[in-house]
Amino acid sequence: MASTLSTLSVSASLLPKQQPMVASSLPTNMGQALFGLKAGSRGRVTAMATYKVTLITKESGTVTFDCPDDVYVLDQAEEEGIDLPYSCRAGSCSSCAGKVVAGSVDQSDQSFLDDDQIEAGWVLTCAAYPSADVTIETHKEEELTA
């Protein structure tokens, strides 16, 4: 008994022409934009949280925006077109001082505020990551230093 092999061949001229997709042509933050994921070192992927930040400002009133947990509140506010005071951008002065009304932030990168001030709700927006949905009154430097 003889067996027969059959194959199907399709001429390339019958298939629609498409440009090949090259990985380098994709946006580098594709996974972050689509799935809230961020590439880590050695190919690891970490989930990234995003929180609602509400700023109560003198000029703009109340403004709310989404802020990833690895972006400083001041930096994201600037990306959103919100003008906030700042000077050092390193958490070592009080120009960007605000007061947390609700929620919480991680401001372990700052060196200006002492533990009592942090416990009282003071925040430096240039060195504060949101750690939950948070509401912050801005433009509070004079009140902090009084």
Curated annotation (Swiss-Prot):
Cofactor: [2Fe-2S] cluster
Biological processes per GO annotation: electron transport chain
Transit peptide: 1-48
Primary location class: plastid
GO molecular function terms noted in the UniProt entry: 2 iron, 2 sulfur cluster binding; electron transfer activity; metal ion binding
Residue ranges of every copy of the 2Fe-2S ferredoxin-type domain listed in the record: 51-142
Subcellular location: Plastid, Chloroplast
Positions with a binding annotation for [2Fe-2S] cluster: 88, 93, 96, 126
Superkingdom of the organism of origin: Eukaryota
A cellular component annotation (GO) from this entry: chloroplast stroma
Alphabetical UniProt keywords: 2Fe-2S, Chloroplast, Electron transport, Iron, Iron-sulfur, Metal-binding, Plastid, Transit peptide, Transport
Cofactor binding: number and manner: Binds 1 [2Fe-2S] cluster.
InterPro entries: 2Fe-2S_ferredoxin-like_sf, 2Fe-2S_ferredoxin-type, 2Fe2S_fd_BS, Beta-grasp_dom_sf, Fd_pln
Family that this chain belongs to: Belongs to the 2Fe2S plant-type ferredoxin family.
Matches recorded under PANTHER family: FERREDOXIN (PTHR43112), FERREDOXIN-2, CHLOROPLASTIC (PTHR43112:SF3)
Self-association and partners: Forms a complex with heterodimeric ferredoxin-thioredoxin reductase (FTR) and thioredoxin.
Its job: Ferredoxins are iron-sulfur proteins that transfer electrons in a wide variety of metabolic reactions.
NCBIfam families in the cross-refs: fdx_plant
Protein name, per record: Ferredoxin, chloroplastic
Source organism per UniProt: Silene latifolia subsp. alba (White campion)
Encoding gene per record: PETF
